[in-house]
């Protein structure tokens, strides 16, 4: 090989230096023209495209190509029906909440990417919190003629959130759960492009059961402040009242909801534990959104199974009281421990990291600043580990009672908590005998052989268990420390200092 020293810039070098610039100009021109022709907020989109190109031309070009390959969904409706939806949305934005009314659904003609010709469909606004400004994209629900389930169209406003929604549903499917499909589409309404949307198709058209949230939405629309996200107004409801299995499905969820049956008797506790833990991994919330959660019902077994759906940004988790079943609580704790390990994220990357990356390009998240989206999942894992190993899992207080002492234990955990030992003065560690628990408090313990296990905190009302400790159990004296951990889960052991109302023993010189 011969290397020649160049006295100037050759023509080939000039061409190679010019090529990236030309590609960039071509990309920006195509990007800009596409949005000028099809996008509502084309100015903002074009500016975002320029910024994305400046950060990484290759990534921006890949994302643009991915978007050009997305299917198109077309909706055509009469002007009067459009105005009816527009008026309903304006009212919802003023109230901050929308309560669907049957008469506000309109008819439309819809063309799906995989269908030939148009199909008739109902179109409506979804119930719940009204999102966005007056000129922002609309969230819509549509139901093709003959279908039972409504499909949802959500504008992609937050690409990172959309990416997590897609990843959440895909992870559920890969772990054995039925889940909705989430497909990015380009939405055209009456010939005008509305931009990038997610089309959510429910997991099944068969009978489902969930909670009717209309009373909660109405209360929120009237200005009521609901710390529980409105769950106090929840009422079991079925998707198809004319289904022969509907009464049994409704009764099954209602029995668990009212506490007449243990939750683990109507659904698989271990599966529900995994479902809840995967929800926290992808959303950061401790449980699925109660208003959107649906369950399938098997008439042969009488069992319910949770169905995955895209979780909203303003998620209202099922309250902890709904999971007031030790079998379910421990299953959730075990799954939180398992899915919060760093190796689990590596497993996800290996199984479908390429698919997630492709969705990131299509949704636009790969072209936005903000770093690695996997970092959000890592943060969620830290929160999951903290949930099963908090700094203050219980309160412990000791006070004299004649010749003996009373130890009061109050669990602050949503999971059963095992008290594994008592350290006395850093010298002696001994187990707490369940027989020391006062007889009137033994109902607050779980039956566990040779173990002292406190029941989970009952909602926001902690319950206290009293133990009568003999004086010799605290010898030789000194500071007292309790050891505890979540029961029947591979969770780390925590330490809790015991508060003393009076010194136990006088210090000897």
Task: Please state what every model-predicted region is.
Residues 159-192:
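A conserved helix-loop-beta module that forms one wall/lid of the active-site cleft
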């Amino acid at each position: 090989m011969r290397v020649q020293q160049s006295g100037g810039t050759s023509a080939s070098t000039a061409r190679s230096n010019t090529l990236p610039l030309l590609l960039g100009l071509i990309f920006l021109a195509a990007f800009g023209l596409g949005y000028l022709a099809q996008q509502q907020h084309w100015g903002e989109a074009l500016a975002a495209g320029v910024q994305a190109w400046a950060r990484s031309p290759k990534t921006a070009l890949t994302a643009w190509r991915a978007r050009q390959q997305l299917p198109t969904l077309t909706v055509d409706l009469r002007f009067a029906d459009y105005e009816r939806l527009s008026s309903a949305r304006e009212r919802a934005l003023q109230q901050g909440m929308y309560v669907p009314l049957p008469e506000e659904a309109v008819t439309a003609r819809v063309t799906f990417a995989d269908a030939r010709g148009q199909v008739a469909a109902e179109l409506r606004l979804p119930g719940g919190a009204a999102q966005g400004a007056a000129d922002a994209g609309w969230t819509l629900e549509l139901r093709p003629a003959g279908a039972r389930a409504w499909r949802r169209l959500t504008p992609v406003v937050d690409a990172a959130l959309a990416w997590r929604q897609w990843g959440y549903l895909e992870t559920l499917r890969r772990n054995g759960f039925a889940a909705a499909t989430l497909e990015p589409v380009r939405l055209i309404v009456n010939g005008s492009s509305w931009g990038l949307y997610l089309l959510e198709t429910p997991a099944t058209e068969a009978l489902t059961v969930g909670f009717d949230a209309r009373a909660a939405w109405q209360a929120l629309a009237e200005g009521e402040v609901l710390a529980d996200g409105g769950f106090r107004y929840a009422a079991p409801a079925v998707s198809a009242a004319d289904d022969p299995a509907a009464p049994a499905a409704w009764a099954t969820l209602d029995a668990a909801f009212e506490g007449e049956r243990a939750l683990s008797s109507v659904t698989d506790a271990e599966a529900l534990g995994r479902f809840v833990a995967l929800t926290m991994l992808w959303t950061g919330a401790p449980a699925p959104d109660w208003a959107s959660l649906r369950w399938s019902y098997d008439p042969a077994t009488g069992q319910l199974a949770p169905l995955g759906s895209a979780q909203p940004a303003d998620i209202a988790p099922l309250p902890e009281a709904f999971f007031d079943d030790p079998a379910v609580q421990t299953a959730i704790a075990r799954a939180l421990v398992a899915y919060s390990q760093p190796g689990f994220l590596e497993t996800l990357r290996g199984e479908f990291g390429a698919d997630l990356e492709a969705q990131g390009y299509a949704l636009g998240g790969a072209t936005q600043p903000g770093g690695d989206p996997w970092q959000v999942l890592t943060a969620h894992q830290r929160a999951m580990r903290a949930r099963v190993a908090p700094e203050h899992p219980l309160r412990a207080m000791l006070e004299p009672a004649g010749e003996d002492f009373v130890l009061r234990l109050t669990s602050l955990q949503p999971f059963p908590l095992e008290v594994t030992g008592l350290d006395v003065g850093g010298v002696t560690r001994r187990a707490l005998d369940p027989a020391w628990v006062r007889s009137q408090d033994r109902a607050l313990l779980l039956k566990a052989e040779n173990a002292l296990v406190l029941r989970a905190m009952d909602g926001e009302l902690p319950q206290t268990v009293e133990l009568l400790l003999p004086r010799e159990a605290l010898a030789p004296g000194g500071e007292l420390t309790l050891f505890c951990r979540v029961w029947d889960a591979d969770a780390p052991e925590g330490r809790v200092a015991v508060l003393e109302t009076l010194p136990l023993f006088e210090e000897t010189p």
